[in-house]
Amino acid sequence: MTNVRIGVMYDRDWNPEGLPEFARRAEALGADDLWVVEDLGWNGGVTGAAVALGATDRLRVGIGIAPAPLRSPALLAMELATLARVFPGRLVAGIGHGVREWMVQVGVAPRSPLALLEETITSVRALLRGERVELTGREVTLDGVKLVHPPTEVPPVVAGVVRPRSLELSGRVADGTLIAEGHGPRDLERIRELTGKGGAGPDHLMTVFAFACVGDDPDEVARTLHPHTEGHGAWLGRPQDEVFTVSGDAPGAADGIRELAAAGADTVVLRFVGEDPLGQLEAVLGAARPPSA
């Protein structure tokens, strides 16, 4: 399994002071990526990325995701450019709609979420390329804004989206699509069709988040996953047993990663549940990448 990147999520419920050591250990175990989360009231995504990047030497760090309504495109581009210059080639920036209820809660719910996301991604990418941006859109206005220190290596900007129109938007304006937990190989085929409808080419990145639980007792694995698959099944509008997970013993979990890779995933980011997430990561990496591979 040489073509797919294997990453790990630093879960939002884990305290921020634990991030540096977790990132260093994930890197030492051989993970390709570490992804941080930005949900209202939890940890900041850009600051979390900075912490993880500063604690490691090789690990690529993703932000999954910065909610467009909470972020000025100019300020977001400034922050991303700073990270990309200091840590070239090691950043992926995810931008999404944000949870509607949370955006209402803080008074930033847009009139048109689709317009805001498209205008934000388009302007952030242009600013990161060093362009002077003039935009009078439905949701975003930028009057001749230009970064003084754009990155020499522009980081990918990916859209964290779920619904069909948003997936088409991602194919039209983003470098890739970030796919939420619970989506399996058959979903990836549909997602690829929708991003392709928006204009995505073969280089459009597909990053998949997946709930993961590695253990030798199948009943215990199922019990550990249950509250997560139940909640996500309700969110996705599908039966719980159709919520895809990377789970089972280490070889079985590695097979789950292979299935996603065969369906087009470029990166699989494991969101471990249960005890000892780094031990689980070590086990699945050992099965996915045996020494003889």
Where are these regions (language model features)?
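Active-site-adjacent structural elements that line small-molecule/cofactor binding pockets in enzymes
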Residues: M1-A293
